[in-house]
UniProtKB/Swiss-Prot annotation:
The keyword DNA-binding applies. The gene is pcn. It comes from Methanococcus vannielii (strain ATCC 35089 / DSM 1224 / JCM 13029 / OCM 148 / SB). The lineage of its organism: Archaea, Methanobacteriati, Methanobacteriota, Methanomada group, Methanococci. This is DNA polymerase sliding clamp. InterPro entries: DNA_clamp_sf, Pr_cel_nuc_antig, Pr_cel_nuc_antig_C, Pr_cel_nuc_antig_CS, Pr_cel_nuc_antig_N. Keywords: DNA replication, DNA-binding. Belongs to the PCNA family.
């Protein structure tokens, strides 16, 4: 069985962040909570989410793989209002996920499930030389600046600085965040073992940060020509994204 109750606002944020990159996913449900991982159709990005049972007001779950049409779920969750209670319940007999919103009224939906099993995808255990933690709002603004110049972006760590830049045929954009020299405390953590530089598809970075709030803290793990790993939390739930670099000749 599976039945869980939570705040609809928090669940919406997790689903929106995940569905920005993938259309369907397998929820791996057990007594500890919900987890899921999936690759985007181009196999450029991997998304992983984890919602431990502690983030739910109530939670009952044994081992199930629940194949979800994320786009359908996203549209239903978008109908939530304010801090409505959200109840998710698996109907094994009808092979559906029931979604209920509770406030002064009760609204019910059901979603047909895919017959899928766990992909067994895991976020690779990669050792990164560098890590920066940055407010999401500042990172997103730097992406918007870079978008004016090119559709690729370079993330660089060097000399106590985190640099985001983009270069076109004629124009260039650069945003520099200096460690220990930021009155707005935009960088909350900076760990550098060696200089690094990698280039990424800008559209993917926009998608995986689209659902963040300005004050969310992004943990960004970097190395030269390595996939970038970005982590952040939503009220106790954890989101992890891995994006392959663009290898320049």
């Amino acid at each position: 069985m599976f039945k869980a109750t939570c705040n609809s606002r928090d669940f919406k944020k997790v689903i929106n962040a995940t569905s920005n990159l993938v259309d369907e996913i397998c929820f791996e449900v057990d007594e500890t909570g919900i987890k899921a991982s999936a690759m985007d159709p181009s196999h450029v990005a991997l998304v992983s989410m984890g919602m431990p049972k502690e983030v739910f007001e109530s939670y009952e779950g044994d081992i199930h793989d629940i194949g979800i049409d994320l786009e359908a779920l996203k549209k239903i969750i978008a109908r939530s209002k304010g801090d409505e209670k959200l109840i998710l319940e698996l109907d094994d007999e009808k092979n559906k996920l029931n979604v209920t919103f509770k406030s002064n009224v009760t609204r019910k939906f059901s979603i047909a499930l895919y017959d899928v099993s766990s992909s067994n995808l895991k976020v690779p255990d990669i050792s990164y030389p560098n890590q920066v933690s940055i407010k999401a709002g500042a990172f997103v603004e730097a992406l918007k600046d870079a978008e004016l110049v090119n559709d690729h972006i370079t993330l660089k760590v060097d000399e106590d600085k985190f640099v985001i830049y983009s270069k076109g045929d004629l124009n260039q954009s650069e945003t520099v965040f200096e460690n220990n020299n930021d009155e707005y405390e935009t960088l909350t953590e900076f760990k550098m073992s060696e200089p690094s530089k990698s280039t990424f598809n800008l559209a993917y970075l926009k998608d995986l940060t689209k659902s963040t709030s300005a004050e969310d803290i992004l943990k960004i793990y970097l190395g030269s020509d390595m996939p970038v790993k970005i982590e952040y939390e939503v009220s106790g739930s954890k989101l992890v994204f891995l994006l392959a670099p663009r290898i320049e000749s």
